[in-house]
């Protein structure tokens, strides 16, 4: 079973785009058995203001935005209003690694 965790951390749209596109295509075309997405750090702000990328990330069901970072940046409420799932991500990351997910960071 092949499982991938895409960890979006960059605030640069051009760096995020390959990870988001790959994740969406991997999910649609069943390239791997499971795809999860963690949105962390500066990428949260970038996605909040980039409707296209935000929508693509939301296509990957279960995408999780970091609550700690979002609260620190004052964006948690805005993200939730747009439909993002905002929660603490430390434990989900550790669990995914323990479950054998390959982590791809963008």
Segments the model singles out, each with a brief description of its role:
Residues 3, 28, 33-36, 62:
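Residues at the starts of beta-strands that form the adenosine-phosphate
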